[in-house]
């Protein structure tokens, strides 16, 4: 049975130097995390911590994905959006719901502090006009506020938001939020977010802003296409590089029409990166 697998590989030789791991024992900080924002090749790294998202989604399975919080704050009129355990960092905050201009205020309590280290209303923190929360790392766009300014913490981070006044009909305000958290391995040294930011952190964020504003991807290296006539063969490539396209062409003329769906389910695509003995990708062709 004939099957052709086509793989288009575009190597990114020059720019890949930025993909090296950080020295062992180096502390995670705003500056080190901002360096990753300035290097799009970090997106392809598999050795990075998982990301967990805390959101206002409808816990009943419905479509009312607003107004759901972790719990009430000890301060009346405030809600706890997330109570995170360290070490770790928040990589993204997204918020919407202030349709009438209500200045929802946020509080960020780091490492068990009783006084918020960082606080401000949604426009100040995520509107893209106040340092270091400047566009395009933080911005108001399409009725939403967001920030990619990293917020590292050694012991923990509690994020609270002002609930706001009720709507005219007495129903709770429709507040939507997303908070992306990455937990770090226990014992990882972390420089907790400081306010005001040290100059080193400000400079790193400015570099990331410049890269994002330029909207320039790493220069492509040599492109080559590999065709495999035998489905049992494995294609191997030396890195660094990027796979841009996978194309599969079964010899349909030799497969009865009633068997084609089953064949697509039986054929498995397996991809392993960087010498791993485990599949990073394993899925049926169809």
Model-assigned labels for residue ranges:
Residues 6-16:
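Bacterial N-terminal signal peptides
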Residues 23-286:
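Beta-strand-centric surfaces of beta-sandwich/beta-rich domains
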Residues 1-3:
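N-terminal secretory signal peptides that target proteins for export/translocation
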